[in-house]
Regions:
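Short, acidic/polar
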Residues: 30-43, 96-113, 156-162
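Generic structural signal for well-ordered alpha-helices
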Residues: 3, 40, 63, 67, ...
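Active-site mouth loops of central-metabolism enzymes
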Residues: 22-34, 87-102, 123-128
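N-terminal binding-site loop/beta-alpha segment at the start of enzyme catalytic domains
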Residues: 1-78
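Active-site gating/metal-coordination segments in enzymes
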Residues: 88-121, 175, 179
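Short, well-ordered coil/turn segments that N-cap beta-strands
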Residues: 11-16, 46-50, 73-77, 113-118, ...
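Beta/alpha (TIM)-barrel catalytic core signal, keyed to glycine-rich beta->alpha loops juxtaposed to Asp/Glu
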Residues: 125, 129-219
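Conserved, mostly hydrophobic/aromatic
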Residues: 6, 18, 36, 51, ...
Length: 219
């Protein structure tokens, strides 16, 4: 498996990563837990070292599955997870207040069976919390050893610049595929300028190659 360096803070990951959301959330019924664990471990055996989850997937269930699956190889893999929602409240509204980040990271660490998170993304930008406060909180968590690297997801160019000025951003995660190429206009050039890595989600168009669309499909 080829390796890639994300950003310039020393994070190296496999060229192919496994997004684990669909095992618990978003695309039909959840995969049976032991089958999901077996799939994740099969990916490890094939050289995948980069695994993506989030507290909102389930909510919480996906982190549990990923944590159990990767516990035997924790020191050999990179785990990315995300914060930014009130997952245990109706409506699951955005919440990136510093005190909330500090509270929810403890739950993620417990579910993932680890004492640190390799890459901690703000899942979505919270318009009610200045991103400088978010970045400052993550910088503190990095200093405490609970987080290794800071990431953003679906953030604008301005937001990326502001966050990066407070705490170096290692990676941005955004949708990118043959069917959605918006990041090419402004985001990818900015990431190259700032030496920030890019992690695409839904690179196969959210199931485009699974038979959902065929020659009989009309638009």
């Amino acid at each position: 498996m080829q390796q890639r360096q994300l950003g310039r803070q020393g994070l190296t990951v496999s060229a192919l990563g496994l997004g684990c959301m669909g095992l618990s959330y978003g695309y039909g019924p959840a995969t049976e837990k032991q089958q999901a664990i077996a799939l994740i471990r099969a990916a490890v055996e094939r050289g995948v070292t980069f695994f993506d989850t989030a507290e909102i997937y389930g909510p919480f269930i996906n982190e549990d599955v990923v944590g159990e699956a990767l516990a035997p190889v924790r020191d050999k893999v990179v785990i990315a997870t995300k914060f930014g929602f009130d997952c245990d409240k109706p409506g699951q509204m955005l919440n990136s207040r510093p005190e909330h980040i500090r509270a929810v990271i403890e739950g993620s660490l417990k579910r993932l069976k680890t004492d640190y998170i390799d890459l901690y993304y703000q899942h979505r930008v919270d318009p009610d919390v200045p991103v400088e406060e978010v970045a400052g909180t993550i910088a503190d968590l990095i200093a405490e050893g609970k987080v290794k690297h800071f990431g953003l997801s679906e953030a604008s160019a301005e937001t990326i610049r502001r966050a990066h000025a407070v705490c170096p951003v290692t990676a941005l995660q955004s949708e990118y595929s043959l069917w959605w190429r918006q990041p090419e206009q402004e985001i990818l050039p900015l990431l190259a300028e700032l030496n920030i890595g890019f992690v695409p989600f839904s690179p196969l168009g959210k199931g485009f190659l699974t038979g959902a669309i065929d020659s009989s499909t009309t638009f």
